[in-house]
Amino acid sequence: MARNSLRKGTLSSVKPSLEDLNDTSEEDYEVEDVMSEVESTDEANDESEEKTDLESTQRQLKSIPFSELLEAQRALKSEKVKFTQKNGAKLSKNRRRHESPSDSEDDDDDRNDRSKHAPVEMSSKRAVPRFREVVHVPKPLRRDPRFDTLSGNLNVDKVKNNYGFVMEYRLSEIKQLEQELKSCREQERRERIKEALKSLRSKLERRKEDERTARVLKEHRQSEKEKIRQGKKPFYLKKSEQKKLLQLDKYKSMEGTKALDRYMEKKQKRRAQKEKKRLPRARPDRA
């Protein structure tokens, strides 16, 4: 009937009969039974294979000596530790990346607290300039005229003549400070004036010493030049001999004055202090 209806072209009038439905249901049931039997046999085969594999592995493990098993266990432990360390390092890096600025500041404070006397840590990072340097511009070099050959050699006599007014200014300043010290009543102000006078007087003394050394050495050179003209060999002074000449000139300039006595007393005190330092220390008395 279905075939006749299809030939006629009327699909809406097609109605399956009971016989056709019974035939299809019986065929489906037979297919399902076959599939279930196949699956059950596959599962049974898998279970049997797993059992045989387990039995074979157990036999192999029984045949392995205990020392080899211990070595394998240690190797597994070491690999596990390495794996955890690598993962820990990766986690710490990720934490640093996703760390908030407040957390990083707290870490910096803790680090500073831990290392109190450590040197200051400075970042080596530098901002990239916006403009690229196409032409290299040489950096201007600063020049100190005191130590540069372009300024020429130092002529001490010329400098003294050119800057002689500085010495006169210092002498006038010393007189002014001495007068101010007499009239001043404040203790702090008096101390400051005394310090200023001390520094100025020491500068004057230093200037006089330099002039004396220059004069003594100049006289010695002139005398040696005269001896060379007479056909004698030149004699060059050592540092120790220069000091002796300067001391003799100093004694001659202070002869017949109280300044020589004061100078000798100071010198004796210095020598006594040096000798005292060289003496061995006294042992403590044992009770």
UniProtKB/Swiss-Prot annotation:
Coiled-coil zones: 30-63, 167-215
Cellular localization per UniProt: Nucleus, Nucleolus
Main location: nucleus
GO biological process: maturation of SSU-rRNA from tricistronic rRNA transcript (SSU-rRNA, 5.8S rRNA, LSU-rRNA)
Keywords, in A-Z order: Coiled coil, Nucleus, Ribonucleoprotein, Ribosome biogenesis, rRNA processing
Subunit structure: Associates with 90S and pre-40S pre-ribosomal particles.
Free-text function comment from the UniProt entry: Component of the 90S pre-ribosome involved in the maturation of rRNAs. Required for early cleavages of the pre-RNAs in the 40S ribosomal subunit maturation pathway.
Family: Belongs to the RRP36 family.
Protein name, per record: rRNA biogenesis protein rrp36
